[in-house]
């Protein structure tokens, strides 16, 4: 997985939440014995919809986002294009990622290839506290975690002093499973 993945964990927005980073640290540091050529991917970070950015260079082609859009939302915006080591994730031509559950692809991406425009480079996850709650967006009562800026008093410059940084879904098999609609997810500004 690390052959074509950039080792830029210190500047990656997914640092601290990245599954690949966790596996890398748990199962031994990558020490290549040969000089391999990295496959060049497309543009560094591109907007694929009103809420999500795609950094194809970081994508490990796990296809979780493709399956989510095909099986859960049934909108099918994503696809894997080209073949072999030139394969890339992208949205189908003429489409953009704009469905009611588009923010969930950021949660299921294991490596930070898909990032949330609202949260991108605003705050590091190790500065966040988490509180269990219920989504204020509608009457469905989705279970959520409120991620707040717990370092606000010591570091007021982080995210311009905002308290609530984001809302993320919390698993509840009877109500919302693992998912959360964008109305609730991006309503965090009204919670603050």
Protein language model features and the residues they cover:
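Short beta-strand micro-motifs enriched in acidic
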Residues: 81, 147-151, 191
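Cofactor-/ligand-binding subdomain signature composed of acidic, glycine-rich
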Residues: 35-38, 158-161, 168-192
């Amino acid at each position: 997985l690390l052959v074509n993945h950039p080792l830029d964990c210190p500047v990656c927005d997914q640092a601290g939440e990245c599954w690949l980073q966790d596996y890398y640290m748990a199962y031994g540091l990558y020490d290549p014995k040969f000089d391999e050529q990295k496959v060049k991917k497309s543009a560094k970070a591109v907007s694929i919809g009103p809420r999500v950015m795609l950094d194809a260079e970081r994508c490990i082609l796990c296809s979780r986002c493709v399956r989510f859009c095909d099986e859960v939302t049934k909108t099918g915006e994503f696809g894997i294009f080209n073949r072999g080591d030139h394969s890339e994730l992208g949205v189908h031509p003429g489409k953009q990622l704009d469905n009611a559950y588009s923010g969930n692809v950021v949660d299921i991406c294991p490596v930070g290839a898909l990032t949330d425009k609202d949260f991108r480079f605003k705050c590091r996850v190790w500065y966040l506290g988490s509180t269990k709650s219920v989504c204020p967006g509608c009457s469905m009562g989705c279970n959520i975690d409120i991620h707040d800026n717990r370092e606000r008093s010591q570091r007021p410059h982080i995210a311009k002093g905002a308290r609530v940084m984001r809302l993320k879904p919390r698993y509840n098999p009877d109500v919302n499973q693992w998912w959360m609609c964008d109305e609730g997810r991006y309503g965090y500004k009204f919670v603050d």
